[in-house]
Structure formats: structure tokens, C-alpha cells
Amino acid sequence: TAEPDYQKIFSTRVYVENKPMTYDVDLTGFPAERDMSMIEPVVKGSTTQDIYQAYLELMSPIQDKMHKMDDSINQTTDLAQRVALAKEAIKLQEEMRHQTSLFIQQHTTSLVAFDLLLESFSSLPTPYTSQQIDEMMGWLKNDWSSSAQYPMLQMQAEMAKHTAIGNHYIDGTVVNPE
């Protein structure tokens, strides 16, 4: 069989719980082309999904600014202006990381917080210091250390430290995220 065209596959993160739930979606809203708009599905009956939806709503204004910033950077040909816009984009990324960190700290028992922390350790280079990574792991330790998933988070955190700010990586050291 042929490999599927992953650009045309609809996907969304849904937190499913073992209880009655509904998943309302408008099939005409599924994007058939990359730039088509999509009507977001509505999941009801999952407390975890509600927490994730609250996170998305918190991040939405910042992400909207990021999308506009990315468009501006891509449309600008003046190098000095692109650099200035890129510096603004870095500040927005820092704001996103800050808001995500606060959200994780406020929802330590939630699977959403666990997933967000796991994602936080996935970027290369890691936008945190080793000390910050240890501190972040401490946020979830009490609630998650006895879970089967926690060793995976620990492993990802240890891998993230290899490219953390201030650590020697391959042939250089990342001093700051800029």
C-alpha cells in the first residue's frame, strides 16, 4: 500500500476518559487543503479535555501574535527589520514558555500538565538550563513519581539536559536561546 499523505490527515489531541463522552465535529470543517480553515471539534464529558481546552484558550492570544509575527518575518525582505521581528518573536516564545510553566504548576495532577512538560523537553536545543529542568521535574514529582509514565518523563528530561543552556553540546555551548 502507498504511504498516506500526512499533510491531508486530520488530527487533533483528544483526552479520552473511561466514561460517557461526546465528540461533535462538522465534517465540512475538515481541511482538504493545507490552507483551508477548520471547524474545531468539541469534546464533552472529559475533565482532562476541559483542562487542555483551558490551556489552548490561555495560549490562543499569544499563538495568534506568533502567527502574525511569522507572517511579517516571511514577508519582510529588509534584513535589519527581520532581525528586529525575530527578536520580538523570541520574546513571544518566552511568554509562551512562561504561561505553559504556570499552567503546569497549577495543574500538577493532570495528564495535560504531564504532556506539556514532556513536550517542553522535546525542543533542540533545550530552551532551559539543567537547573531549570530539575526544578520543572519537581513540579510533577509528588503527583507522578509512582506512575508508570514517570520514567519516560525522567528519561526525556535527562536527554534535554544534554542540549540545555550552558551545557557543552557537540562542538559548542548554548549560552542563551537567542
Question: What positions do the PLM features span?
Answer:
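Short solvent-exposed coil/turn linkers within tandem alpha-helical repeat scaffolds
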Residues: 106-110, 142-151
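A non-transmembrane, solvent-exposed segment enriched in polar/low-complexity residues
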Residues: 1-91
